[in-house]
Amino acid sequence: KGGVDLYYEAAVAGAIPILRPLRESLVGDHIQRVMGIVNGTTNFILTKMDESGAAFGDALAEAQALGFAEADPTADVEGFDAAAKAAILAGLAFHSRVTDSDVYREGITKITATDVAVAKSLDLVVKLLAIAELTNEGKISVRVHPTLISRSHPLASVRESFNAVFVESEAAGAMMFYGRGAGGAPTA
């Protein structure tokens, strides 16, 4: 209304203080990529599928029973929540106005226990990643989708309802912000 932006750290990645570093600490650096696990519900589900071979529906039911997932989990499992967070991260990282409609979005509902098992056999893990990066043409690409990542990548170690944001910049290099991402207290 008044042409001002409001910043709430819990709006992206729960208890992780990521908005202020992007807006203030790294403002003089040239960020090349921001990618992260920004939805604790989907990370919990994918972790259960990876660790115990659970089916998607069973892992979702457990997330709901523990209070990590809403009764209607559509916003989480279809990637809408992560897309909104990706837009916020991209806007701050690249000093641009980015909206949810600018974000390619794909959720995790089509991921099967077999998909996760095959990934595991290849020393990979499935994560729903929000990715914002500058293309070679200098444009901003923002997307949310299930991604296969090496188990040696720092994001692969993010389990259960935890979130993490991995930032790659020209001066600072690679850094990861990590913390609780779902549930009442982390998102309050």
Regions found by a protein language model. Give the residues of each.
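ATP-dependent carboxylate/acyl-activation modules
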Residues: 152-188
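Structured core elements
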Residues: 7, 33, 45, 127-128, ...
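Short coil/turn connectors at secondary-structure junctions
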Residues: 2-4, 28-33, 139-140, 162-163, ...
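Rossmann-like NAD(P)H-binding beta-loop-alpha module
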Residues: 2-69, 76, 80-81, 88
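Short beta-strand segments
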Residues: 36-39, 145, 168
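Substrate-binding/catalytic subdomain of NAD(P)-dependent oxidoreductase enzymes
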Residues: 49, 58-157, 162-164
